[in-house]
Amino acid sequence: MWVTSTVTPETAPNDAFVPDQDGISDKVLDRMGVTVTSTSPMMSFRNNFNTEMSMGIFWDGYVLEVSAPMISGGAFLDITDPHVGGSFVSGGYTGEIDSTAMNPLAGRMAWSGNSGGYIDTVINMGPNLAGQTVTLRFRMATDAAVAAPGVHIDNISITGASCP
């Protein structure tokens, strides 16, 4: 489960944290009701991750997804899906979750491995979300074995959108 943590936030007093557990899991952190007001919305955040990876193989990781009624009918798609139109400016996904892993994200690009501390991620959310009220979610998934410290996300900012 994602929790509010005060242990190692980038900025006080807290951040969002999810551990990388040693069992199959699929955990989400949603932000509902983001109204996109621009044709060039941008999202930025700081993230610090240490997820299971061994010998260059990514076993656990997390992604950013969006649900937009006029694009996906409410289904969640990756922020980089062509229908969404988003792209990373910096700090994008680091590897593909192994396709043989018993991980709900198997075969998908994700943030995985060890970031070595907080890094900046900047995303051009693309023009396709303009005029829609969307739900954004971070989705962390793990395979059946080996725990790691987990994921911290802090300082989320979205321009070209309003959040109630």
Predicted regions and their residues:
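Beta-sandwich/jellyroll recognition modules and their flexible linkers
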Residues: M1-P164
